[in-house]
């Protein structure tokens, strides 16, 4: 792949742990396409539940993947995001293969919260940047090394909201939430809802605290930069948007702002 044994070893550790640190100042943007392809594969695996991987290995059958609602949701988001990024990055000069590789890399580094820097998506339009901000919250599957909310909680919340809407039209009906053919108990749904309420509350408070700190002790930055910095800190990603984007860093922030982000 063109890397030394030392660099390969370090990148393998930070990929599987979804840590995202690199031995290069430019992160992985200057690595060969072969190296990025290898990192892509293991970022994708790092975002999958290790219990599911173990079951698949023991059964020696891919049926375990097909049975998992969470795996199908996770993979669908990766494919959809990669397709959107490919539509943005594709050009005749780079070639279709390189564009596909870069698109998958960008989606995986965000969804799995690895945080490697590959493309400068800061120059993309507001629609793409908003979508990227949303991906920063998602995270991989439960039981993986990825950070974020985790896809199983997102699925449970979406199905819970769907059931509440159904109850408006069918007030006497009883709706159950299924996950991979298993019915989720009500206590689990309540815990997921509580998690989201606390998560949103912490995000709002963190954004408010960081805004005050930056505007008091540092040079003011955009609201987009503040939002993405809080999202990045809460979900263990690293890069954000705007002033803390993929080719920037947090060096310019004052000590109090860094403490707030560290707590988050």
Tell me the role of every PLM-derived stretch.
Residues 1-264:
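Membrane-proximal intracellular helices of multi-pass ion channels
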